[in-house]
Amino acid sequence: MKKKKIFKLISKTYLEEHDAEGYYFKHESGLEVFHLKSDSFKENAFCIAFKTIPSNNTGVAHVLEHTIFCGSSKYKIKDPFLYLLKGSLNTFLNAMTFPDKTIYPAASTIEKDYFNLFNIYADSIFNPLLKKESFMQEGYNINPKDFKVSGIVFNEMKGSYSNKNSLINEIVSSSLFEEGAYKYDSGGIPTNIIDLTYESFLDFYKKYYTLENCKIFLCGNTQTEKNLNFIEKYIIRPYKKEKSNVNINIENVKRWEKGKKLTYKIPKENDNSLGVYTINWLCTEINNIEDSIGLEILSEILLDDSCSFTINILKSGIGEDIAHISGINTDLKESIFSFGLQNVVENKEKEFKNLVFSELKNLVKNKIPKELIKGILFGYEFALKEEKGQNFPIALMIKSFKGWLNGLHPIKTLQTSYYINEITNKLEKGIYYFENLIEKYLIFNNHYTLISFIPSHDTEKEMEEEIEKKLMAREIEIKQNPEEFLQFKKDYNQFKKYQNKKDSKADIAKLPLLKIEDLPKQIEKSLDLNEIKELNLHSFKFKSNNIFNVNLFFKLDFLEKEDYIYLSLFKRALQDLSTKNYSYININNKIQNTLGQINISESYDEDIDGNILNSFNISFKSFNNKVKESFELIKEILININFHDYERLKEITLSLKNDFKSLLIPKGHLLAMLRSKSKLKLNEYLKELQNGITGREFWQKAKTDTESLKEIANKLDNLKNKIILKNNLSALIMGNTDDILKNLENEFFNLKESLEESNHYNGLLNLDANSKALREIIIIQSKVAFNAICFPSYKINDENYPKANFLEHVLRSGIFWEKIRVMGGAYGASASIANGIFSFASYRDPNFTKTYQAFEKSLEELANNKMTDDEIYTYLIGLIGTNIYVKTKATEALQSYRRKMLNISDSLRQDIRNAYFTITPQDIKEISTKILTQIRQHNSIASLVNNQIYEEEKNNLEKLIGKEYSLKKIY
């Protein structure tokens, strides 16, 4: 009897830009599968996706995305996702809620691990337990004693709504849709999240998590048939639901005949905070792929610093800087283009709108400079031809779902090169393609909103008051019915018991894990680099698509304290100012038309003996036919940069100020860690000067009048004279032929010879040896806290380092997750050991002192209780997995170079890997005791919290750390 085909092949399509075949299948259940297959792909990935349409702001899709991984019919443990974090070799593991879809992607370089991940994801998504206790944990819960509310999603979104830019993004999207999915925040608004009922939550799952609403994207080198058989066995056969015929298409909105003017309040960071103006257009459907890609390119053109549109609007003085919202949003069925200014003059929204339209009309009239268009398109061409690194399949999947979930073939939105060629052909025929887009989607498009965002101290207060009002009403209502109140208390008590309950060994044992023999025991060895000592140059030959890479390293040995603060502006200015021979517009066009990519950064490094090896790094890459041109351009920038271009310097300085100002909420945990580490090591102190709260405060106070700009320019000149020096410079060059490497070597030699010698003395700073450990509480305007504690620990060459590194993984992916995230309600918690410092931190945390207690209690538990052999093995898998990821050859070469500079040998790395395999439960018990001693002997604490949390927990804080701490406010 002939075997019936389970899946019908709809099409087979070759995707040229990725040298891959795309197989598109449909199952009779309605489930669709697309497999993008190529033997060149280094990791295998899958993504299970559903269209999920919100009808309110309760964040039900978001809460469901979190709760999906709280146990399933086959894997009844409380958090299978946590076991994947600590016990798989994954290269990607996540779940994401978008405005109109929810996706569940994962990836691994090991085929067996890939199918293990797929197995757990499949059962979690299609057969979840969805217990009420999980709903309360991940969504929100109300304590019957005081009717205070908490929950992971609730706290996450409180943090999000404390962030000005996040709030603006959400308001802009909803402003263009008077009805339908995009009117609502799929993540949830805190005031509405507490309205979500458990029954509505279950109904949402039943409606949207069906086979006919499911799309599965596969990417990698595994066999297509093997994947389809897996899906049939683990998804389709166990599926119990009846087929649903619910229509979940998103209707296009009716276009307006006239734009709308709106006003909203946003959080006021300080008394001097200024507002934001934005104008936002609803553009085109995603199925108009050419224009969608065209609008993406147009967005880059309009927002380019050399475009007259941006230049003239900034010159107007209406606002200080381009708003973060500016650009194209293609995550929706219909795209949105926004342009905005931040720190604006009050009551100038009409002038702002008129100026935007006037400058757009001028661009159409005078035409966009061809060199600008050519440069932007060159960047796209280069990106398509460059070797792809880690998580490249995930980016492809997200891009595919934009069209696939809205009725297009899954490969359509991946065919970027085809549509760019179509656009290029039109340009070559003399068609003013981008000017036509400006007219069609911006100038003559009446479906737009002009929004004034006014800073107010009332926004968060009003949100808290609304939450309190709802909770009070809920309390009165529940307490009026004794039976209902009794059930309410029972539910909460059951929830707390659930959180404290341990998973059974029998349930844990059901999880599919890799065997010990599946784990790579040998490290990936460093690459052999060729060295030319007299030039301080290393080189590496590798297969590339006729692309070369150059990494320049300038030592930072001659800097003083203030110099480090100016580094942030210095690295921006090098890319964004005029030079002796070129205006800013001309040098910008040359960069875009010559370099495929340029990146300027700094590294704060120590070698294995603790010697500081900090460097200022300039990396660039391009096609082989642009070697000489690229080096000439870099030479022009390094030697002839004009820091005294005051008009442009002012714009860059204001942009830096605004970027620093917006760091607090999205990067609060990193700022707390930087601050905490700064009293423990000189290098951490220097890093904090540049990138931390010290740097932020300095630039917030910086003035931009003419005299101040002259002083800044002189500082930058001085900094250049200390860094861009012949005897400071070393390099790593990479290319695909001996001839190219020789060309690169010659050009590097010429560059080096054109630089001046140093006449400075080593200026490394000293950290005050008598400085006390930091105890600092920083008051910020946020409804959530960011806590960090750091302390001296083991360096990489210490015999205890492998055990401490293993403990880091146990804390980060195990006990901190349980105590701080699951039970504490924080959005995240971390542990890391690097350069002899152990760091613990929490992110978007509703707690303050409780988190510090949780850090220490976690260590106490591990010191007082032995882990099992099975637990050790699970963590071993995950720890090995943190060292396995997809790297390009260029990345491998750069890593090898850095290891050589830091004296980290392959033999040391192999010794550490070997040690991981010998670690026992007793070792973890002992190392936990040692780390506990370390944290108690000498630690440094920094917390970013709001004033209310601080006042409420002040007494607890002083019991924990005493009264000797500093208190400061920042905005």
Swiss-Prot record:
Recorded GO MF terms: metal ion binding; metalloendopeptidase activity
InterPro entries attached to this UniProt entry: Metalloenz_LuxS/M16, Pept_M16_N, Peptidase_M16_C, Peptidase_M16C_assoc, PreP_C
SUPFAM superfamilies for the chain: LuxS/MPP-like metallohydrolase
GO biological process: protein processing
Annotated Pfam families: M16C_assoc, Peptidase_M16, Peptidase_M16_C, PreP_C
PANTHER family noted in UniProt: PRESEQUENCE PROTEASE, PRESEQUENCE PROTEASE, MITOCHONDRIAL
Protein name: Uncharacterized protein BB_0228
Naturally occurring in which organism (per UniProt): Borreliella burgdorferi (strain ATCC 35210 / DSM 4680 / CIP 102532 / B31) (Borrelia burgdorferi)
Phylogenetic placement of the source organism: Bacteria, Pseudomonadati, Spirochaetota, Spirochaetia, Spirochaetales
